[in-house]
Design a protein with these regions (language model features):
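C-terminal motif of bacterial Sec signal peptides marking the signal peptidase cleavage site
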Residues: 17-20
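Bacterial signal peptide processing site
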Residues: 22-25
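Early extracytoplasmic/lumenal segment of secretory-pathway proteins
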Residues: 36-119
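Extracytoplasmic ligand-binding site segments that recognize negatively charged/polar headgroups
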Residues: 53-67, 110-266
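A ligand-binding cleft/hinge motif common to bilobed small-molecule-binding domains
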Residues: 115-118, 280-295
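Periplasmic-binding protein-like
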Residues: 138, 249-253, 293-316
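Conserved C-terminal helix/tail region of periplasmic/extracytoplasmic solute-binding proteins
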Residues: 269, 376-412
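Mature extracytoplasmic/periplasmic domains
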Residues: 306, 310, 314-382
Length: 412
């Protein structure tokens, strides 16, 4: 069995921390409902319940409200009769909290790798029956059996699948080129070190940082390049010395940050009105801003980047499992995959979507990082065992990442 149990005991505590910062059983309508929590709940998709509730990142579940060209919800509703309701979450911790507190309320969640295993180990999500998802074999082989959504929970030597890959991408350095005068920033130092920007003014108070605890890994990526004596190899497996160094860098950054962002649309407003000029960000914000003003651009700093590979997971007490399975299948259609990749600036989980999509264009996947998969430090939940079997190694677990980053943001 994959070793992820050493942080299981803190899962509910993390949910409480996240909720501080930031039902009933459903009738499946299908057949064969195993009692074993390690087995899929249904063996065939029955009649839809008329609705499905999804927790997602902003921009992931679009019905054309922001831009009529991007709508993959309305066609699903028309085809299945399942009305989609969407709750957006701003951090992985918020997603975990919503799912753990939302039994009987939510069906699905688009979980990143720093949330997915917490949801599995707390039995908040259920294993999926891939036989009910006919398009699963179209998923990129890099993602089909990825460790952030496949776990051998019953110890039989075969991993169960808990998620359907959705999209993947990486965190970019968003900047305003009107401030940088055509000199694209090549290092994360622009958000970590006080300096004079090309417009002749200090960066102090004009940069932002992500307010999720997983951002500590971004500091570790920066330190790996600039302080090699620390010996950082994995930004999610930090020993005490490495972790303390990352915290010290983040405390230094605290003096520069104008806002810790978690709401993508608030960050868009901050850049649009000039309050922010550089920050870690998602391609989504860049795309929305650049559509109005081409001065808003992004770069990939030389130190490297963190990123996410998101999978759609089903709540153990999903009230609408039939509609949920219908959405899981729908989520893999080429048009949705390509349109979403164009909208968010990500790479589709279904690689055939990279060709022939009018919005994405045939060059879109390469532009969004298709060739960089092996260079991205994908989000994972930090564990005390450092992801290995060596009892001599000990890393700082995620609970402490959460509590310490909250303290940094609070000025402590």
């Amino acid at each position: 069995m994959r070793k992820i149990s050493r942080w299981l005991a803190v899962g509910s505590v993390i949910a409480l921390v996240a909720s501080a910062c930031g039902g009933g059983d459903g009738d499946s309508g299908g057949s064969g409902t195993p009692a074993d929590p390690d087995e899929p709940r249904i063996t065939q998709v029955g009649e839809g319940e008329g609705e499905v509730s999804i927790i997602s990142w902003a921009g992931y579940i679009e019905r054309g409200d922001t831009d009529p060209a991007y709508d993959w919800v309305t066609p699903f509703e028309e085809e299945t009769g399942c009305a989609v309701t969407n709750k957006t979450a701003n951090t992985s911790d918020e997603m975990v909290a919503l799912m753990q507190e939302g039994a009987g309320q939510y069906d699905l969640v688009t979980a990143s790798g720093d949330a997915s295993l917490r949801l599995v180990e707390s039995e908040t999500v259920q294993p999926l029956n891939l036989e009910l998802i006919e398009s699963y074999d179209t998923v990129d082989p890099n993602l089909q059996d990825a460790p952030w959504h496949t776990v051998d929970t019953d110890g039989d030597g075969t991993a169960e699948h808990y998620g359907v890959p959705y999209q993947w991408g990486y965190n970019v350095l968003l900047y305003n080129d009107a401030i940088f005068k055509g000199q694209a920033p090549t290092s994360w130092d622009v958000v970590f070190e006080e300096q004079t920007l090309p417009d002749g003014k200090s960066n102090k108070g004009r940069v932002q940082a992500y307010d999720g605890a997983i951002y500590i890994a971004d500091a570790a990526v920066y330190l790996r390049a600039h302080d090699p004596d620390l010996g950082i190899t994995d930004p999610y497996a930090l020993n005490r010395e490495q972790f303390d160094a990352a915290l010290n860098l983040l405390r230094q950054q605290r003096e520069l940050v104008g806002r810790y962002w978690h709401d993508a649309f608030v960050q868009i407003d901050d850049f649009g009105n000039g309050e922010a000029v550089a920050s870690s960000s998602w391609p989504f914000q860049r795309n929305v801003l650049a559509a109005e003003d081409p001065d808003f651009k992004s770069s990939t700093p030389e130190e490297g980047v963190t990123g996410w590979a998101d999978t759609t997971m089903m709540h153990s007490d999903a009230p609408h499992p039939n509609c949920a399975y219908m959405w899981l299948e729908w989520s893999l259609n080429e048009k949705l995959q390509g349109d979403l990749a164009a909208w968010f600036g990500t790479v589709p989980a279904v690689l055939s979507a990279c060709q022939g999509n009018e919005l994405l264009t045939d060059e879109g996947c390469e532009t969004n990082g298709l060739g960089d998969f092996d260079q991205i430090e994908f989000w994972r939940t930090p564990q005390a065992d450092c992801f290995d079997d060596d009892e001599a190694t000990e890393c700082v677990p995620y609970l402490e990442w959460v509590t310490q980053y909250v303290a940094v943001i609070g000025g402590r």
